[in-house]
Amino acid sequence: MGAHLTHLARARPQPLTQHQRTQKDTMRLQKTVTVDKPLDAVFDYLSDFTTTTDWDPGTVTTVNQRGDGGVGTAYLNTSTFLGRQTQLTYIVRELVPGQRIRLQGENKTLTAVDTMTFRGVQAGTEVIYTAEFTFKGPARLLAPLLRPAFKRLGKQAQTGMHNALNQL
């Protein structure tokens, strides 16, 4: 019996590493939109992040604070989520014309990384939109509870993006 207890003591879970905590606290959504529109037109439209007001149902406003849309451009995004209004400052971190744009948004409770990857396909253009949300501080405890609401928002944004791109 003593040996069995010693084995249990050694099998105790170890604290999570910073990487493991970050993975656990990060929520990832990925949606694909395919439209019968030219790649250049789709890229030009979506790389202007102020257009989120057209297709993201949570966005109230997105204002270009500084920059020409390229790397380093800053956008102030005001969104409503579960009845609360919040602001994130997004910075364009990567922009490869016609291929990819990656933005990072921050506020005191959340870091969001939004990546849009573009590909010409027979039907027109395919956009793969990936959003990763990493919660900070006490908000980390709410992450698992918010997952269903974020998934709903992702589906609504996918539909909104599809509709907006079809208007181009």
What would you call each of these model-derived segments?
Residues 7, 19-64, 70:
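Hydrophobic ligand-binding cavity/cleft-lining segments
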Residues 11-13:
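Compositionally biased, low-complexity flexible segments
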Residues 31-33, 88-94, 113-120, 131:
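Hydrophobic/aromatic beta-strand elements that line small-molecule binding cavities or substrate pockets
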Residues 63-109, 126, 156-168:
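Glycine-rich portal/gate segments that line the openings of hydrophobic small-molecule binding cavities
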Residues 104-156:
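Beta-strand/loop substructures that line and gate deep hydrophobic ligand-binding cavities in soluble
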